[in-house]
From Swiss-Prot:
HAMAP family in the cross-refs: Succ_CoA_beta
Name of the protein in question: Succinate--CoA ligase [ADP-forming] subunit beta
Function in brief: Succinyl-CoA synthetase functions in the citric acid cycle (TCA), coupling the hydrolysis of succinyl-CoA to the synthesis of either ATP or GTP and thus represents the only step of substrate-level phosphorylation in the TCA. The beta subunit provides nucleotide specificity of the enzyme and binds the substrate succinate, while the binding sites for coenzyme A and phosphate are found in the alpha subunit.
Record-level GO cellular component terms: cytosol; succinate-CoA ligase complex
Chain sites annotated for binding substrate: N264, G321, I322, V323
Organism: Haemophilus influenzae (strain PittEE)
Tagged with keyword Magnesium: yes
Residues given in the record as ATP binding sites: K46, G53, R54, G55, E99, C102, E107
Domain of life of the source: Bacteria
Positions of Mg(2+) binding: N199, D213
Gene Ontology terms, MF aspect: ATP binding; magnesium ion binding; succinate-CoA ligase (ADP-forming) activity; succinate-CoA ligase (GDP-forming) activity
Pathway: Carbohydrate metabolism; tricarboxylic acid cycle; succinate from succinyl-CoA (ligase route): step 1/1
Cofactor note: Binds 1 Mg(2+) ion per subunit.
Length: 389
């Protein structure tokens, strides 16, 4: 679950991390009231969406007075912001965050992620702040500095000092950075985060470090023990199909292809998308129905996939480990009839009672293309998408 910048900075404040004063508005009428809470004669106005690249898309602007702030709010509130991280529809802008400005001397990058290979939290710091970190990693990897945090012990002061030295910080700034590092480490572990990013972390001309931006992603599997964070979820930022899928415990991610994919198991789902791509097709989605692929869940999966008007064919790839393939076959037939599927359906079954399942599909009166291998299934699906079935 992603948080908005203003929500992330509220958490930062709670953990004693240095941020500039800011306030959020949800209507143009609130702009004057919000700015009255802030000092200075110019402010940073930021569209609040769950996506990066806001600045390049015009979603961040330095406003010089109240009128310019109102104009920015009028332009964006109720509109959708399209960035390189969104789809072509963009994300809805429901709030504008106004923040006091500061005089910047240097910009740094600081983030933390879970490294599953080492089973630790990795902090990444770079003197190249305010830039796309992907470009830094590709073009100047020597500017990335890392330390690993053992989740049993948390961040240790010497690790913060080590990163600070590598960033060229000494004296007071070294201590400030270490304090920020320790606070972010506590925040990451105590709130079960999966991503934390400060880009940029700035050194002001007055010699103070400030978290000028904040990005936080919370592990969805840990939300049950963080009711306060769960309450911050902004469902308007979610794809409507993804939100609907969550209700039925389906893992769905919308893509931009025309071959709908329904698979049990995340790894198999990713492999299915890979082979569809290999055969020249484009997956329309990632959809994992999980181990308990019941008739009801299969039916809901069909409904969700078919809400995408781009879908020309549906590829069902099921490995019968926990579930039996004959039951899956019956569920697919029932779901196709119930939903009224009008596009070709390709089904590949493997595992427990796979042969029985294929026989059930063959004897049904439903127009289903049966595949005996994943390669054949992908080829059938790609051809069907081209109208060659």
């Amino acid at each position: 679950m992603n948080l908005h910048e203003y929500q992330a900075k509220q958490l930062f404040e709670h953990y004693g991390l240095p941020v500039k004063n800011g306030a959020v508005c949800q209507s143009v009428d609130e702009v004057d009231l919000v700015l009255a809470q802030l000092s200075g004669d110019k402010w940073a106005a930021k569209c609040q969406v769950h996506a990066g690249g806001r600045g390049k898309a015009g979603g961040v602007k330095l406003v010089q007075d109240v009128e310019e702030a109102r104009s920015f709010a009028e332009k964006w509130l109720g509109q959708r912001l399209v960035t390189f991280q969104t789809d072509k529809l963009g994300q809805p802008v429901n709030q504008i965050y106004f923040e006091e400005t500061c005089d910047i001397d240097k910009e740094f990058y600081l983030s933390a992620v879970v490294d599953r290979a080492s089973q630790k939290v990795v902090f990444i710091a770079s003197p190249a702040g305010g830039m796309d970190i992907e470009e830094v990693a590709q073009n100047t990897p020597h500017l990335l500095h890392k330390v690993e945090i053992d989740p049993l012990f948390g961040g240790l002061p010497y690790q913060g000092r080590e990163l600070a030295f590598k960033l060229g910080l000494s004296g007071t700034q070294n201590k400030q950075f270490t304090d920020i590092f320790m606070g972010l480490s506590r925040l990451f572990l105590e709130k079960d985060l999966s991503l934390l990013e400060v880009n940029p972390l700035v050194l002001t001309q007055q010699g103070n470090l400030v978290c000028l931006d904040a990005k936080i992603a919370v592990d969805d599997n840990a939300l049950f023990r963080h009711k306060d964070l769960s309450a911050l979820q902004d469902l308007t930022q979610n794809d409507a199909r993804e939100a609907e899928a969550e209700k039925f415990q389906l893992n769905y991610v919308a893509l931009e292809g025309d071959i709908g994919c329904m698979v049990n198991g995340a790894g198999l789902a990713m492999g299915t998308m890979d082979i569809v791509k290999l055969y020249g097709g484009k997956p329309a989605n990632f959809l994992d129905v999980g181990g308990g692929a019941t008739k009801e869940r299969v039916a809901e999966a069909f409904k969700i996939i078919l809400t995408d008007p781009s879908v020309k064919v549906i590829l069902v790839n099921i490995f019968g480990g926990i579930v039996r393939c004959d039951l899956i076959a019956e569920g697919v037939i029932a779901a196709v009839n119930e939903v009224g599927v009008r596009v070709p359906v390709v089904v590949r079954l493997e595992g427990t009672n796979a042969e029985i399942g294929r026989q059930i599909l063959a004897e049904s009166d439903v127009n289903i293309l049966t595949a005996h291998s994943l390669q054949q299934a992908a080829e059938l699906a790609v051809n069907a998408a081209k109208g060659e079935h």
